[in-house]
A protein has these predicted regions:
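Conserved beta-strand segments of alpha/beta enzyme cores
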Residues: 53, 103, 119-121
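Active-site ExK catalytic segment of metal-dependent nucleases
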Residues: 75-84
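Active-site-adjacent loop/helix micro-motif of nuclease/hydrolase catalytic cores
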Residues: 84-93
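Short, hydrophobic beta-strand segments that form beta-sheet elements in well-ordered domains
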Residues: 102-108
Length: 133
């Protein structure tokens, strides 16, 4: 594991204001759109799961997990994607195996829920919060 901080701007409205982004169309075409989505998801999860202990995980080899939650005695991995149909990545496989995750949730802006593999499931932000709360 690598010990280094990762900076999130958890208030996406503040981020958008600082960058002069006033409309959704501006955001969609801006390079910060992925980071904005990631920060928004993390803020919503932490606000909805006050008993969770949150961490960021990254290895020397570059595998990373956007959010690692210790919740109700379980290790839950959260990977945040803006893609329409996220697929399994080597980082996800590493996280499931190395961290011995109970499960890994891939959060995306879509609404179709589906499995990617053993312990790995793609779902919407509202579904993930409802399941973990």
């Amino acid at each position: 594991m690598v010990k280094s901080p990762k900076v999130y701007i958890r208030d996406s409205g503040l981020l958008h204001t600082l960058l002069g982004i006033g409309e959704r169309e501006q955001l969609e075409g801006h390079p910060v759109v992925g980071g904005s989505w990631e920060g928004f998801v993390i803020e919503q999860m932490l606000a909805s799961l006050p008993n969770a202990s949150p961490f960021f995980w990254r290895t020397q080899a570059g595998a990373e997990l956007d959010l690692l939650l210790f919740l109700k005695g379980r290790r839950i991995g959260i990977e945040i994607k803006r893609a329409d149909a996220p697929t399994m990545t080597p980082s996800m496989v590493s996280a499931v195996n190395d961290l011995e995750l109970h499960r890994l949730l891939v959060i995306y802006p879509g609404s179709t829920r589906y499995r990617l593999g053993h312990k790995v499931e793609v779902m919407s932000l509202p579904e993930s919060i409802a399941e973990l709360a």
